[in-house]
């Protein structure tokens, strides 16, 4: 593994509950842009990151694996002085945040996966593998993936914009390498049985990372797991149903017992 990198990031809010948000395979941190205006920035402080090969880290060298991504997330938490924090990961980012939990379980308050890739990986049939593997150099493949995983219901303009963003804000070589890691690696034995509260949010229109798949993986591995399925939503809840996503995720994060301690600490007088 290469040396850790302090991931490019932006901070939103100044609340006591710290949260690190990790994007998925087809986007950089701008994937979270649709939800940013309506977050509770008094209760939470969000660090939204770019993984290696994406966004401001597009040219960063590395192995482009979920384990490396987790080490980079922990390095950022150290730089920010965040001893404990919650995690949000979308799709591939869901695998990365589960890797963080495996590496440093004592530091994770709550775990959220938005259409998360399971810690067991996501084996793909040959035709699907060809589609995904070819997406690094073929934008049309990315469009097919976007369209399929949102139930074929999204407008052409949105699909085109998402493809442009994906191509512009990712390095093709890194993009292809990330696929081998998130799809092919199985580390679920390292997180199975973790008592950390873990929420999986899925879209009813997503045929790939469905509620059924999460029941067979996420819900079995985490004793304190919750599953929410958003209707009329596919794989990209930040774009498709941003307000519903915010409500579900922030309600889950607020349920942390440590929030009471945070509030008391914030209001304590010297």
Regions found by a protein language model. Give the residues of each.
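Flexible "cap/lid" loop of the alpha/beta hydrolase fold
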Residues: 98, 102-103, 108-138
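Gly/Ala-rich beta-loop-alpha elbow adjacent to hydrolase catalytic centers
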Residues: 89, 93, 97
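Conserved acidic catalytic loop of the alpha/beta-hydrolase fold
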Residues: 68-84
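Short beta-strand immediately N-terminal to the catalytic nucleophile in serine-hydrolase-like folds
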Residues: 87-89, 114
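Catalytic active-site module of serine/aspartate enzymes centered on a nucleophile-bearing elbow/loop
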Residues: 224-270
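Conserved alpha/beta-hydrolase catalytic His-Asp/Glu region
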Residues: 122-123, 138-193
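Conserved loop-alpha-helix segment in the C-terminal half of the alpha/beta-hydrolase fold
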Residues: 199-233
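Conserved HGGG/HGGXW glycine-rich cap/lid loop of the alpha/beta-hydrolase fold
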Residues: 8-59
